[in-house]
UniProtKB/Swiss-Prot annotation:
GO terms for biological process: ubiquinone biosynthetic process. The gene is ubiA. It comes from Legionella pneumophila (strain Lens). One of its GO terms (molecular function) is 4-hydroxybenzoate polyprenyltransferase activity. This is 4-hydroxybenzoate octaprenyltransferase. The chain crosses the membrane at residues 17-37, 40-60, 90-110, 113-133, 135-155, 163-183, 207-227, 231-251, 262-282.
Length: 282
């Protein structure tokens, strides 16, 4: 019998926050590069590509961490670690996902291919960075930002100042929210030697997260002023600032379950700023 439920959990389809956090920056880029009106074809290609590559990343991560996950309370029952899905099944599933992603990539301009290759290479590298690099979130930041240049290129745009600002926003955002995520597993990671910015930043973790959030949210303001957008953007910008403030409140005591909740709340920030960009470009 095919373990469909286990496959769903292996791909994290039951926890769509990862897909959303990868999709929102790509959506921001698509809206910016197309003056608020991306084509349906581009939307479908990038949306499906986001789902396929995020799922592939989860499989790669679980293959690489299958011996580590059993020592972490939050991950010890993942399908590969528990034996619900075999290693060979995981590799077959990964192959299918990569083939599906390649099929979509062939519909995009050739220059998108180079960024896609970088994305795949970083995705394969990331799980192993947690073993020897003190700040693997920097690597994740690159992997989760590759959809931005691809969206601009696929839309026939150069990698202009909008791209640079958006890339910096997303890169900083990823480091911030994934540090919150890593704070959830900090105690277990210290025991087994897994590295993260939650450990590397030590007692400065909350301060650095706060500075990153202030920096990235200020960049949105710079972009908006430069574009001379309407007041609706600023209303949503203030709403998003409230979300960031709430996240900082959640992580203040460094309670694992609250840190994980703060990570999940990042999805609301991405959604609000998507609406903000959309309204700004109408």
């Amino acid at each position: 019998m095919i373990p469909w439920n286990a496959y769903v959990r292996l791909l994290r389809l039951n926890k769509p926050i990862g897909i959303l956090l990868l999709w929102y920056p790509t959506a921001w880029a698509l809206w910016m590069a197309n003056q608020g009106f991306p084509s349906i074809d581009l939307l479908m290609i990038f949306l499906l590509g986001t789902v396929f590559m995020r799922s592939a990343g989860c499989v790669i991560n679980d293959i690489a961490d299958r011996h580590i996950d059993r020592h972490v309370a939050r991950t010890q029952f993942r399908p590969l670690t528990s034996g619900e899905v075999s290693l060979s099944e995981a590799f077959i599933l990964l192959f299918i996902l990569l083939c599906a992603s390649l099929f979509l990539l062939l519909k995009l301009p050739i220059n998108c291919f180079y960024f896609a290759v970088i994305s795949v290479l970083i995705t394969f590298l990331y799980p192993f960075c947690k073993r020897f690099f003190n700040a693997p979130q920097l690597v994740l930041g690159l992997a989760f930002s590759m959809g931005i240049p691809m969206a601009f290129i696929a839309s026939g745009k150069n990698l202009n100042s909008d791209f640079i600002v958006l890339f910096l926003i997303n890169f900083s955002w990823i480091i911030a929210y994934d540090t919150m995520y890593a704070m959830t597993d900090k105690a277990d990671d210290l025991k087994i030697g897994v590295k993260s910015t939650a450990i590397y930043f030590a007692s400065y973790d909350r301060l650095i997260i706060a500075l990153l959030l202030i920096f990235l949210h200020s960049l949105w303001l710079v972009w908006a002023i430069n574009k001379n957008v309407e007041c609706f953007f600023y209303l949503l910008w203030c709403t998003a600032a409230g979300i960031l403030t709430y996240q900082l409140k959640l992580i203040y005591a460094r309670i694992p379950k609250n840190c994980f909740k703060a990570f999940l709340v990042s999805g609301y920030y991405g959604l609000v700023m998507w609406f903000a960009v959309g309204l700004a470009l109408i």
